[in-house]
Every structure is written in structure tokens, then in C-alpha cells.
Amino acid sequence: PIKHSLSPIIHNAALTALNLNWCYLALPCETANLGLVLESLRKINCKGLNITIPHKQEVINYCKAVEPIAKNIGAVNTLIPAKDNYWNGTNTDIQGFLAPLKKCESLAGKDGVVLGSGGSARAVVHGLNSLNLSHITIISRNRNSLEKLLNLIELTKSTSTTYLSLIEGDSSIKEYIRDSSLIVNTTPVGMLNKSKKKESMAIPLGKEYW
């Protein structure tokens, strides 16, 4: 997914505007090489890292310390240099996700759908719980990651007004989307024009899609 990222354009423009002699690069990394890449970047005095899918959960294992907000959702998307060539981890996904939503009408008492159950989904569900939605339905193809997400939410006691389920088949997905006011896609679907699921994931008129 790193190939689709607009982060280099955004951050390099900001660095130029601030007259900082830094650069922001997108670096492909296989999971098997994650530890080696992180160690190498720290040794060359890299000033910080953003972590994207599929590494947001695995990267926790390489952090010297993890901030509470990242611990609560079990995912890290930002690494900050620490002493002795270590990294500290945090998560800014929640703030980034909620910022535009707070400019919209209140979602309190309404239903929402989250597509996916990985690291980004963890942050999204955590953020949605602060908006007092009536129900949140999580739709995932990966039962293992979904069960881990449900266990995490249960441990953080954030399920008092949340309905969570694994839905099989496009027809069921469309039913939940139809009855919800907010749809959040945390999956790779839609990142590439050649996505095979593009047509089947068409969003009904009047729905908010993030």
C-alpha cells in the first residue's frame, strides 16, 4: 500500500515551507525485514517514521516505549527517536480521523459501519466510541484479526453502545451500509483503480464515506 501514499508530497511541501533541510520518503518494507529496517533507520539518525498497513501492530514489538493511546488500540503509526538507538511509538490515527468528523453534524445515536479489522480499524473504532454512536458494525474478511479487535475492545470496556459482527457476503454488507449513517473504509479496497471490489462496494446515495 505504500505506493499509493500521498504523504511524501504533503510532508515535503510542509518541510519546504518551514525551511527545514529534511526529506520525507516512502520506503517499502516486507514484514520479515521490519526489525532490520527500523534498526538501520535509527542508526542513521532518522528523525521519525510513519507506519502504515500492514505493520501497525507488529511494529509495537520494536518499540522501547508505547504511549497509552497506542497501547489502548494496539496499533502504532508514528515512531519517535529514543535513546540508545531505540524507538518510542504513538498513534495519531484517532485525531486525524476525528478532526473532519467533528465539523459535521452530530453522529450521536446513529449507526456506523467500519470495513476492516486491522490497525487502522482499531483507531477508528476507538474514535467512534467517543462520538456516542448507537451501534458500530465491523465487517471483516479476516476472522482472526476481527477476534483480536473484539477482545481488545472488550478489555478497554468500550462496548457499552457498540454492536460488532462479522458479515459474510456482499448482500449482508449492503444491508448494514443501507441502515448506517457513516461508512469508514480501513481496507486496501479502492486504493488502486484495478480493485476487483470497486463496483460491489458502491455506496448508496446520501451516505457519508470516509
Q: How should these model regions be labeled?
A:
Residues 1-104:
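Phosphate/diphosphate ligand-binding glycine-rich loop within oxidoreductases
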Residues 133-156:
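NAD(P)-binding Rossmann-fold cofactor-contacting core
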Residues 51-58, 119, 188-191:
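Short glycine-rich anion-binding loops that position phosphate/pyrophosphate groups of nucleotides
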Residues 91, 101, 105-133, 140-143:
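Glycine-rich adenosine-cofactor-binding loop
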Residues 49, 112, 183-184:
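Receiver (REC) domain switch-region micro-motif
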Residues 161-210:
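Rossmann-like adenosine-cofactor binding region
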Residues 47, 110, 134, 159:
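Short acidic/polar active-site loop segments enriched in Thr and Asp
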Residues 28-30, 142, 166-170:
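Conserved acidic residues
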